[in-house]
A protein has these predicted regions:
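Active-site-adjacent structural elements that line small-molecule/cofactor binding pockets in enzymes
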Residues: 1-293
């Protein structure tokens, strides 16, 4: 079971280079497999959009919480580490031009030695997507096409590649360098909806269900696997990433995740960990319980 840790942006220190490096280097030294960074290009004050992972419909983060660009943050971390995986959770796909994003992801993956894993989502904040020039009502279709665009560019050779889609088209496009893996940067799909589960089954290298547990989680995994089968894919080939908190992670949690077919768990600090030292203590205790180092 691979274990990752989520950047504790709740502390309000994710824009501080010393804090970022201490967190990342500690995670690597303790034996964690990856760190994961979140994205919001902008946060709209007093947004009318409902945050789907809170019973109040409001995000637990203040509007002025520092949220660095995740790819820039991971590039910074890549140069200061040697083994640590570099993940997003999630990158809001409709905020990005996929031609440019393909180059950015390939560059990060190449220069980090193939350590990149990207979790994409369609986003929940209408105003953010619109501020980035996207269409909230078409965000599912644009995400599907973005995945196709990036994979086409990564697979294209010296003669270039052609693409004709609903939102993007090009002829003879060459995009180098390529990702380290011939299959490209792994693209996981994150979300809580049936649409996200189906997208993961149809198109994803993995599925990262968010905010789900119990019967809802089992149902989402089943939807993903059915969609994979319907698309002619092997459902077992779609990786599954689950979540937990650092203090609750133990051997029984790993067994539970493995029974669902997961090979990776992303761990967050508890609400009690309100300082960096407290987060690092939870990480160290978890690493000792799981015999990581």
């Amino acid at each position: 079971m691979n274990l990752g840790v989520v950047m504790p942006v709740e502390l309000g220190m994710a824009g501080d280079p010393a804090t970022v490096l201490e967190f990342a280097r500690t995670a690597e030294a303790l034996g964690f497999d990856e760190i994961s960074a979140v994205e919001h290009a902008v946060v709209i004050a007093n947004t009318g959009s409902e945050y789907p992972y809170s019973p109040t419909g409001k995000s637990h983060l203040p509007d002025d919480c520092p949220l660095p660009d995740p790819l820039e943050l991971l590039s910074f971390v890549a140069g200061a580490t040697s083994r640590l995986g570099l993940a997003t959770g999630v990158l809001v796909a409709p905020n990005h031009n996929p031609v440019v994003l393909a180059k950015r992801l390939a560059t990060l993956d190449r220069l980090s030695g193939g350590r990149t894993r990207i979790c994409l989502g369609v986003g929940w904040m209408r105003e953010e997507i619109e501020a980035c020039g996207g269409d909230f009502t078409r965000r599912g279709r644009t995400t599907d096409e973005a995945i196709a665009v990036m994979r086409a560019l990564w697979a294209g050779g010296a003669d270039g590649v052609d693409f004709a889609g609903e939102f993007h088209s090009f002829h003879g496009a060459c995009s180098f360098p390529k990702p380290m893996r011939e299959s490209g940067v792994p693209l996981y799909i994150g979300g809580h909806s049936a649409a996200a589960a189906r997208r993961a089954g149809r198109l994803g290298d993995g599925f990262q269900p968010l905010g789900l547990g119990g019967d809802d989680l089992a149902a989402a995994v089943a939807v993903m696997r059915t969609a994979a089968s319907d698309a002619g894919r092997d459902p077992s080939g779609v990786a599954l990433v689950l979540g937990a908190t650092l203090p609750r992670m133990d051997a029984s949690k790993a067994e539970w995740a493995a029974a669902l077919g997961a090979d990776r768990i992303l761990l967050s600090a508890s609400r009690r960990a309100t300082t960096l030292d407290a987060v690092l203590d939870e990480m160290a205790a978890c690493a000792e319980r799981m015999h990581l180092a």
